[in-house]
Structures are given as structure tokens and as C-alpha cells.
Amino acid sequence: MKIAILSREPRNYSTRRLVEVAQARGHQVEVLDTLRCYMNIASHSPSIHYEGRELESYDAVIPRIGASITFYGTAVLRQFEMMNTMALNSSVAISRSRDKLRAMQLLSRHGIGLPITGYAHSTHDVPDLITMVGGAPLVVKLLEGTQGIGVVLCETHKAAESVIEAFIQTNNNILVQEYIREANGADIRCLVVNGKVVAAMRRQAQPGEFRSNLHRGGTAEAIKISPEERATAVQAAKIMGLDVAGVDILRSARGPLVLEVNSSPGLQGVEAASGKDVAGKIIEFLELKASRKNKPAE
């Protein structure tokens, strides 16, 4: 196959691994800087241009779109889809998962376990919002935040009021969530590919920190997940419409709780911790998806 990878970082571990595996399996791969792609949105002949040239057709596209460029990145991916290029994850599914509030509402609607979560517009509702999630300590999350940025643990009622009001008054959209004390600063990242958990790791926050993101100094180790955790991860990815996803789960007294469903999960931490060839599983699935698309109707 001829595969395009949309990535702003060609030297990034995840991008390099996908290129290496795809080439080793005989595919032709080109890494395209998402923000350098530009589009001709014509009725009968839509096209994508890159560095002054019109791109030829690709059999498949792998989107590695960072959260900060979701709007433009999904627009580029839609253009590939308009040109009948098969996407590893669809633009619709990526947009759905990137809207954290919408994602939480969809997961809630389907009965997926979640931390108690509140959302409000007015500072007048802050006291009730704090009560709604069980009081302090609680967690405040910027809807646009990634990699643990914009996530604040408020340990007292007064601190919670101050932080929430400050965010609202500066026109930031936030979620307010209960703090799951029994998780002890750890979460589980499950890598789901084609409806199966192909690898999992436990991420532990460093001492004095509650955010377990590896970008924030957290550590990772292999973990054996329970059947309930496995089913939760698979179902969460399915609800988002993602064929490849990183599902973040907290272990709580009432069972697994989903924190987030990531449409462009990093591979370095989970491959190192689990010893699994996740990039290989992704390319194998891409081949399977292509064969299904090209299979003639009986």
C-alpha cells in the first residue's frame, strides 16, 4: 500500500515506529506535516497540495494529529476521506473524542463508568457544582488541556471555589470531577486496536504529584488488566468510533472509571512497559481494513 502519515514530528517515536513497521511489511510510506498540507475543495476533483505540489492518491492515511491542531488536522483528514483515502481513524471519530465534554456525555449515555463530573457556565453555580461531585478534594480540568496540562487538584473547598471561579471568569471551559483517592495517583492506559486491547500499562505519578502522565514525570510498568477493565476499554473506543485508541482508566472502589479516550495515543511508553509490538498491530489492522474495503461485493 501507499500510506501517508499525518504528523508534525517525523522524528517522534510513534511516527518512526509506524514508518519502520510499514516499510518492513513492504509498504510505501510518506510522512506529511499536517500544517503544510493545503486543500482545493472542488466539487468533482478535490485535491491536497504539499510544498507546491499536488499529492498523488494514497491507499491509506494514518492521522497523528496533536490536540492543538485538531481543527486544521481533521479538515485535512476530511479532504483525504473526500478523495476516497481510507483513514485509520475517521475525522468524525477524532473530533468526537477530542471534545472532552461531548465524549463524557456519550460515554455516560452508554453506561460507561466515569468519575462524577460537573460542568457549569456561571460562577453563581460553583458551590452547588462542588457539592455535586462530592466536595473537596476535587479535580478541575481545562477542556482544551492535554498531557496533564490544565489539570488542577483542589484539596480544600476554598481552593476549589477560587480555582473554578478564576477559570470561569477568564472564559475557560472546564470540567469539575470527583477525586478518586483509592487510585493513589495511578491510572491504566489500554491500547485498543480493532476492538481488542493489544497492550496495557500502569502509569504512576511521581511523589507529590497526582497526574500520572508520562510527560509530567510519571513512570510506567506492565499490568494485567481485569476482564471488566478490558471490556470497558473496548466499549469506550467503540462508542467514540475509534479503531485505534488509548483509553485511560482509573481503578476505583466501584469499578473501572474512564478518564479519557485518546485518538492518537503515544506508543513509546506502552511498548516499553508492555514489551508488545503495538505499531505492528496497528499496521496489521490497517492492512486488514484495506482488504475489507477492496473486497468485491458477492
Curated annotation (Swiss-Prot):
Entry's cofactor comment: Binds 2 magnesium or manganese ions per subunit.
Swiss-Prot/TrEMBL keywords: ATP-binding, Ligase, Magnesium, Manganese, Metal-binding, Nucleotide-binding, Protein biosynthesis
EC number(s) from the headed UniProt entry: 6.3.2.-
Obligatory cofactor(s): Mg(2+); Mn(2+)
Molecular function in Gene Ontology: ATP binding; metal ion binding; ribosomal S6-glutamic acid ligase activity
Annotated Mn(2+) 1 binding sites: D248, E260
Single GO cellular component term: cytoplasm
Binding site for Mg(2+) 1: D248, E260
Binding site for Mg(2+) 2: E260, N262
ATP-grasp domain segment(s): 104-287
Domain of life: Bacteria
GO biological process, one term: SOS response
Range of residues in the leader sequence: none
PROSITE patterns registered for this protein in UniProt: ATP_GRASP
Residues annotated as transmembrane: none
Binding-site list for ATP: K141, E178, Y179, D187, R211, S212, N213
Gene3D superfamilies named among the record's database cross-references: 3.40.50.20, ATP-grasp fold, A domain (3.30.1490.20), ATP-grasp fold, B domain (3.30.470.20)
Chain sites annotated for binding Mn(2+) 2: E260, N262
NCBIfam families found in the cross-reference section: PRK10446.1, rimK_fam
Family under the similarity heading: Belongs to the RimK family.
Protein name per the record: Probable alpha-L-glutamate ligase
Native organism: Aeromonas salmonicida (strain A449)
Primary gene name: rimK
